[in-house]
Amino acid sequence: MSLLNIFDIAGSALSAQSQRLNVSASNMANADSVTGPDGQPYRAKQVVFQVAAQPGQETGGVRVAQIIDDPAPDRLVFQPGNPLADAKGYVRMPNVDVTGEMVNTISASRSYQANVEVLNTTKSLMLKTLTLGQ
């Protein structure tokens, strides 16, 4: 593996973590969205990563394979005066776990920062390699 491959690998990680941050931000923004375009509460999303290695390579980058709906059930909130409440007075709310999303955001941010550091270290090594013969 050459040092140039590191740029591709770390770059793919930056892109994947950026998408993860976007999905988490969308989840938190819609944590209280009781109805969407289909009349149903917002469904939290999850990012599924996949190895993006070249055939025959043991190492490689990462890519977002898909963005799926979180299978967790909707939250039920007792609001008998709400026009969207069911016969028992419960309103179906999005299945967004705000605390979990904050943890996910911090994790994605740290991973992004770590990959930026990988790029900076690689750049520094390449510059030092160029000055070896001087």
Swiss-Prot record:
It is found in: Bacterial flagellum basal body. Keywords: Bacterial flagellum. The keyword Acyltransferase does not apply. PROSITE patterns: FLAGELLA_BB_ROD. GO terms for cellular component: bacterial-type flagellum basal body, rod. The keyword Cytoplasm does not apply. One of its GO terms (biological process) is bacterial-type flagellum-dependent swarming motility. It holds the Pfam family Flg_bbr_C. InterPro entries: Flag_bb_rod_N (IPR001444), Flagellar_basal_body_rod_CS (IPR019776), Flg_bb/hook_C_dom (IPR010930), FlgC (IPR006299). Its main location: other. The basal body constitutes a major portion of the flagellar organelle and consists of four rings (L,P,S, and M) mounted on a central rod. The rod consists of about 26 subunits of FlgG in the distal portion, and FlgB, FlgC and FlgF are thought to build up the proximal portion of the rod with about 6 subunits each. Belongs to the flagella basal body rod proteins family. This is Flagellar basal-body rod protein FlgC. The gene is flgC.
